[in-house]
């Protein structure tokens, strides 16, 4: 900056020397011209000069090129007019012009409209015009107001020249007319030269501005830099010379006796704008240029460019960030919003760069000192009775005490980059610390990075004993709140250089140690920096008391011991949003009441970009924890129940989370992952960090809390080891107590009984080990060492088959075993007898199933995206969720502990979490509709036969994952209309099927069948009331049809003959032999058909192993001999065999179908072959024509 200033001064001096030389030459020429003009009695006409001067005023612009181009033309015209003007023809106009020019020059030299000058002018008209600039008083420097403008205008209107006065002046000036004309011409030339000088000065300013902009482009726009020296010089010189604005300069035009326009009063204070740092620097350089020009020439009025923004009356501007700034010359510049008395000092400690490697640094912290630069002591309080650093500060503490942050533990947080991210609050008036007056303290903030010493270090190391207060000093930094340029270093993130603390012992001085380092000791750079932010904080009106006060305004308030225990035992109080609403949630399912199958979609929850692998409700039912997967990681997402509100994410795992479980008191969450760790998370407000990490050598597939003691955690790993951990909730470590290596393969699942006396572990080879796990609360480690094996379960049925999931039955006597052979088993642990549940496909994925809390139903997911429901007591499949929007296998199912609610999840691209709930009102409305439409659709050609096709209501398609309110959105009339339309569509299909049957078939069954069919009707008939009572909900779309008697026969299922032997590889396949006649119920695809053989066996069989009877008759004799068909007697015997009472088709080929029980009248029994065959045919045709929709299907 100094170089640019010196160059400007040199150029200005050179220019003025040239101008003065030119001016002296012109004066010589003018003197010669005077003599010629006197001799020839010719007067110089100044009209041309006036017109040129007026033209320059009108065309004055910021473009110096225009001025430069006009200057030669003006000079030429001026010289020509001066030499050729004739004063004899312009005597009258010249006299008027002289008077007006005198008035104009006086007004120009006194822009404030001083009345005394006007009075002197009128009182002494014979004297010459005063050329010197009058001395301005302090009143002239005051800003201009509208009232002053009005007064000045009023004065100017009264001081216009009168005709009588002009006549007297002209008479007195007749004698020396020639001399006065020359003097006036000289004045005009001086005014013209003044304008030329101003234009050249503007051109110089423009060049300086351009250079300064290029040099200052790297400064940020929101930072203000001011030079104290330049501003002080500018203030001094502004008091001497008034600055005029270009826009406020009056314009004069002389023609005849009129003056166009009026002179305006101009403010003596220059406008100051805070738009940017560049404008401030450029304006200061322009002022310095003016000052240098004033040093070389006499002070004359000069024009400067007006700032783009107007100055407010209170001298306040708004910068680009919307911050009000005080622009008074006597006060420092900082945002006005920080001057509020309600604000207090807030220091936010962000972090440091990586500290220097030192094994002695394990938990650094930052100590903040508020020191006065004048005294070296802590800053005195503005109010001695106001607590600033601590709530219990006494009045005798009249200074601001230092405050420290919390320590950052490298070991616990697994990082050597300290990130405190902590807000430190000093309850001191913020404007008091920012005052720049001599009486106010000049505040410096000192930051010390410390590490506390252990007791052993202090005892063993004598050098450490010399350390003050048992702290090891690592580095320090400082920050001045008000810089040397008067700007406040606040409201932005600052990076402070750290320095080594001096090694020499401290001298006993009465100043703060950090201040002594700053003022007297050399500063050796520490290879790191500290990031801080200082700002004014508004203190909240109400601060809740706490066990330990964290700031000066927070009260410490303790609670009784029993209140603390009650608080620890309830996890509801620790959840956000639940403390405000203290009402108890009333669940729909009463204690001891049997569970219902949920029949209404409640809402869908977001599970991340890759879906959810496992989920679980908390024991109190208020939180749903879901182990999800996203692009950035594998978070555990917590949702509030029943609202479905998102609570928070627990991030830390680096790979898929296989298992998730809650502690018995719901204070902790345990997860196991394939990243080789099991993690414990605290269920607390705003706590998203890992509480404990249990490291393992490989993948961890399962982890559980011990039901009796939450400090014991059991994990199952890929290395076939079971590990027991003791987790101290109040200490920083987890201790590995014991390891078991009984299993020969990796462990997939663990579970405990309710009391925690037994544990069950299952591995990949189908082996289940029962453990005795009784513990004593007072001696955990000793109890764990006494854990033994109770027995090993090695069933031949699932030997070598991986066990996916284990769960104890609510009665504690049975065990749910989910294996990867598409079979679920519930085993009685006393006699080791298991009941099978077939239908849910599971051959590849790790899928979890679940039992309801009452043990009434068993829910299991499948790889085909269907959820199956069984009755564990009977083994019957009672329902299925057949059209869920999942494209991936359903991984986990969780049933709510207190509500008839279930949650499903799948692991795949954008798979949601679905929650279903039981709605009694929906079930009641559907029951009424079922009764109303029972048996009211007569069909032509078919006689009384009731075909009950029972389906659950169509569930709405959830395209988006928005939470639906649990309310009734449809009225009963609207539902009735929808059901009627649905029933009409179905009955049309049945009519077409019946017409086809009546047209093509005719057969008469023997009379003996009538008695059998009547018994079958009584056994298979299941009324709507029984269905509703058993399953707790009803179905829409119920079809009840009465058929009239006819002489036509109902078509039997087509039959095929087996050409080759086939042995079933799966439980849902059919074993056939050559020559077997198979009834085909439906063709699943071109490769697999579904049917039954004469022994009552049903299942899938390959289509390429069979042929129709017609094709079989055309086969060569050698093939017929190898696979002879059944004899007519055997065939008749098979046809007359009683149909089974229960019809159940379990399908896992990605389709769902419905079975109905059919009942016939006695007249119909004589004309139809078999109830079983007719039921399968009708069911198959109905399935082909059903409408797409999401259903829960009940199977009788």
From Swiss-Prot:
GO terms for biological process: cell surface receptor protein tyrosine kinase signaling pathway; central nervous system development; cilium assembly; cloaca development; heart looping; hindbrain development; morphogenesis of a polarized epithelium; motile cilium assembly. It comes from the Eukaryota. InterPro entries: AHI1_SH3, Cilium-Associated_Jouberin, SH3-like_dom_sf, SH3_domain, WD40/YVTN_repeat-like_dom_sf, WD40_repeat_dom_sf, WD40_rpt. The modification Phosphoserine is found at residues 45, 1002, 1123. Residues 141-434 are annotated as: Interaction with HAP1. Residues 80-91, 102-113 have a biased composition (Polar residues). Residues 141-154, 166-179, 224-233, 1117-1136, 1161-1182 have a biased composition (Basic and acidic residues). It is found in: Cytoplasm, Cytoskeleton, Cilium basal body; Cell junction, Adherens junction; Cytoplasm, Cytoskeleton, Microtubule organizing center, Centrosome, Centriole. Residues 92-101, 300-309 have a biased composition (Basic residues). Residues 13-45 form a coiled coil. WD repeats lie at residues 607-649, 652-691, 695-735, 742-781, 797-837, 841-880, 885-926. Highly expressed in the most primitive normal hematopoietic cells. Expressed in brain, particularly in neurons that give rise to the crossing axons of the corticospinal tract and superior cerebellar peduncles. Expressed in kidney (renal collecting duct cells) (at protein level). Its main location: cytoplasm. Changing residue 723 to Q: In JBTS3; loss of localization at the primary cilium; loss of positive modulation of classical Wnt signaling; no effect on interaction with CTNNB1. Residues 56-186, 215-242, 254-327, 1115-1196 are annotated as: Disordered. Residues 1051-1111 form the SH3 domain. Keywords: Cell junction, Cell projection, Ciliopathy, Cilium, Cilium biogenesis/degradation, Coiled coil, Cytoplasm, Cytoskeleton, Developmental protein, Differentiation, Disease variant, Joubert syndrome, Phosphoprotein, Repeat, SH3 domain, WD repeat. GO terms for molecular function: identical protein binding. Induction: Down-regulated during early differentiation of normal hematopoietic cells. Up-regulated in leukemic cells at all stages of differentiation from patients with chronic myeloid leukemia. Involved in vesicle trafficking and required for ciliogenesis, formation of primary non-motile cilium, and recruitment of RAB8A to the basal body of primary cilium. Component of the tectonic-like complex, a complex localized at the transition zone of primary cilia and acting as a barrier that prevents diffusion of transmembrane proteins between the cilia and plasma membranes. Involved in neuronal differentiation. As a positive modulator of classical Wnt signaling, may play a crucial role in ciliary signaling during cerebellum embryonic development. This is Jouberin. It comes from Homo sapiens.
């Amino acid at each position: 900056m100094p170089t640019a200033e010196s160059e400007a001064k040199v150029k200005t001096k050179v220019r003025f020397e040239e101008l003065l030389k030119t001016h002296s030459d012109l004066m010589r020429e003018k003197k010669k011209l005077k003599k010629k003009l006197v001799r020839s009695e010719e007067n110089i006409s100044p009209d041309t000069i006036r017109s040129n001067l007026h033209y320059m005023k009108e065309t004055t612009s910021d473009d110096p090129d225009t001025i430069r181009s006009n200057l030669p033309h003006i000079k030429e015209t001026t010289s020509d007019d001066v030499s050729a003007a004739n004063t004899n023809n312009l005597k009258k106009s010249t006299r008027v012009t002289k008077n007006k020019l005198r008035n104009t020059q006086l007004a120009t030299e006194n822009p404030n409209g001083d009345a005394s000058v006007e009075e002197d002018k009128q009182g002494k008209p014979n004297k010459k015009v005063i050329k010197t600039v009058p001395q301005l008083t302090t009143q002239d420097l005051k800003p201009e107001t509208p009232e002053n403008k009005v007064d000045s205008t009023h004065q100017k209107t009264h001081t216009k020249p009168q005709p009588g006065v002009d006549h007297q002046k002209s008479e007195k000036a007749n004698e020396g007319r020639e001399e006065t004309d020359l003097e006036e011409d000289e004045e005009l030339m001086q005014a013209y030269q003044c304008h030329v000088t101003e234009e050249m000065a503007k051109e110089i300013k423009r060049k300086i501005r351009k250079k300064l902009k290029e040099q200052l482009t790297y400064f940020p726009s929101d930072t203000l830099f001011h030079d104290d020296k330049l501003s002080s010089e500018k203030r001094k010189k502004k008091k001497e010379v008034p600055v005029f604005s270009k826009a406020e300069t009056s314009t004069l035009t002389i023609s005849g006796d009129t003056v166009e326009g009026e002179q305006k009063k101009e403010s003596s204070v220059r406008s100051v704008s805070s738009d940017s740092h560049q404008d401030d620097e450029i304006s200061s350089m322009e002022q310095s240029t003016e000052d240098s020009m004033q040093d070389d020439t006499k002070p004359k009025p000069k024009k400067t460019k007006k700032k783009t923004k107007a100055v407010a009356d209170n001298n306040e501007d708004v910068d680009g960030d919307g911050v009000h700034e005080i622009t008074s010359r006597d006060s420092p510049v900082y945002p006005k919003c920080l001057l509020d008395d309600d604000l207090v000092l807030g220091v936010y400690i962000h972090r440091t760069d990586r500290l220097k490697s030192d094994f002695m640094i394990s938990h650094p912290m930052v100590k903040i000192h508020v020191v006065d630069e004048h005294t070296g002591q802590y800053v005195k309080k503005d109010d001695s009775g106001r607590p600033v650093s601590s709530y219990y500060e006494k009045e005798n503490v009249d200074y601001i005490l230092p405050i420290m942050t919390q320590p950052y533990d490298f070991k616990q947080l697994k990082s050597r980059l300290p990130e405190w991210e902590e807000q430190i609050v000093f309850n001191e008036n913020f404007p008091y610390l920012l005052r720049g007056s001599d009486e106010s303290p000049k505040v410096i903030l000192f930051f010390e990075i410390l590490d506390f010493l252990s007791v052993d270090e202090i005892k063993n190391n004598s050098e450490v004993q010399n350390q003050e207060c048992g702290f090891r000093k690592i580095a320090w930094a400082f920050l001045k709140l008000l810089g040397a340029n008067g700007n406040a270093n606040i409201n932005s993130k600052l990076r402070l250089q750290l320095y080594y603390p001096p090694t020499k012992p401290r001298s006993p001085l009465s100043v703060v140690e950090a201040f002594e380092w700053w003022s007297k000791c050399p500063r050796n750079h520490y290879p790191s920096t500290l990031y801080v932010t200082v700002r004014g904080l508004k203190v909240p009106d109400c601060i809740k008391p706490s066990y330990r006060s964290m700031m000066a305004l927070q009260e410490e308030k303790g609670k009784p011991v029993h209140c603390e225990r009650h608080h620890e035992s309830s996890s509801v109080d620790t959840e956000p949003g639940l403390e405000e609403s203290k009402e108890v949630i009333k669940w729909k399912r009463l204690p001891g009441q049997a569970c219902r199958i949920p029949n209404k979609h409640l809402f869908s929850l977001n599970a991340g970009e890759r879906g959810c692998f496992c989920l679980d409700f908390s024991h109190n039912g208020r939180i749903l924890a879901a182990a999800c997967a996203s692009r950035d990681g594998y978070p555990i997402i917590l949702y509030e129940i029943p609202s479905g509100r998102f609570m928070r994410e627990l991030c830390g795992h680096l790979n898929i989370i296989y298992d998730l479980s809650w502690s018995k008191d719901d204070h902790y969450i345990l997860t196991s992952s394939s990243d080789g760790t099991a993690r414990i998370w605290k269920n607390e407000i705003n706590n998203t960090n890992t509480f404990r990490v249990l490291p393992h050598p490989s993948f961890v597939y399962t982890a559980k809390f011990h039901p009796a003691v939450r400090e014991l955690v059991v994990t199952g790993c890929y290395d076939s080891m079971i590990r027991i951990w003791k987790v101290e909730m109040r200490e920083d470590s987890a201790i590995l107590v014991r390891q078991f290596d009984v299993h020969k393969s990796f462990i997939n699942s663990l579970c405990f009984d309710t009391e925690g006396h037994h544990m069950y572990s299952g591995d990949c080879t189908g082996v289940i080990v029962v453990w005795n796990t009784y513990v004593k609360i007072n001696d955990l480690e000793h109890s764990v060492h006494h854990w033994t094996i109770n027995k090993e379960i090695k069933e031949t049925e699932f030997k070598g088959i991986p066990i996916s999931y284990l769960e104890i039955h609510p009665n504690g006597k049975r065990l749910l075993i989910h294996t990867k052979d598409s079979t679920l088993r519930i085993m009685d642990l006393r006699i080791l007898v298991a009941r099978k549940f077939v239908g849910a496909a599971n051959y590849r994925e790790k899928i979890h199933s679940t039992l309801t809390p009452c043990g009434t139903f068993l829910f299991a997911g499948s790889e085909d995206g269907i959820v199956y429901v069984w009755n564990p007591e009977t083994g019957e499949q009672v329902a299925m969720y057949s059209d869920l929007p999942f494209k991936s296998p359903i991984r986990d199912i969780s049933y709510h502990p207190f509500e008839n609610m279930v949650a499903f999840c799948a692991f795949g691209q954008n798979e949601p979490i679905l929650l279903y709930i039981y709605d009694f009102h929906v079930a009641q409305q559907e029951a009424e509709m079922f009764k109303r439409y029972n048996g009211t659709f007569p069909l032509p050609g078919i006689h009384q036969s009731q075909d009950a096709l029972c389906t659950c209501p169509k569930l709405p398609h959830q395209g988006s994952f928005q939470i639906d309110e649990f309310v009734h959105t449809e009225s009963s009339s609207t539902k009735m209309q929808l059901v009627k339309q649905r029933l009409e569509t179905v009955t049309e299909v049945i009519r077409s099927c019946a017409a086809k049957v009546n047209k093509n078939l005719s057969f008469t069954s023997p009379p003996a069948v009538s008695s059998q069919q009547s018994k079958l009707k009584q056994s298979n008939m299941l009324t709507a009331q029984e269905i509703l009572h058993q399953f707790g909900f009803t179905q829409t779309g119920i079809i009840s049809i009465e058929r009239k008697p006819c002489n036509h026969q109902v078509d039997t299922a087509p039959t095929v003959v087996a050409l080759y032997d086939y042995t079933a590889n799966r439980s849902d396949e059919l074993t056939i032999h050559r020559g077997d006649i198979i009834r085909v119920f439906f063709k699943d695809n071109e490769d697999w058909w579904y049917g039954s053989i004469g022994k009552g066996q049903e299942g899938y069989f390959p289509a390429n192993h069979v042929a129709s009877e017609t094709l079989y008759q055309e086969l060569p004799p050698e093939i017929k001999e190898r696979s002879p068909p059944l004899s007519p007697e055997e065939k008749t015997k098979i046809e007359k065999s009683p149909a089974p009472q229960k019809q159940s088709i379990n399908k896992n080929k990605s389709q769902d179908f419905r079975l109905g029980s059919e009942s016939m009248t006695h007249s119909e029994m004589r004309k139809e072959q078999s109830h079983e065959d007719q039921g399968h045919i009708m069911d198959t045709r109905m399935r082909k024509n059903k409408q797409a929709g999401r259903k829960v299907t009940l199977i009788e």
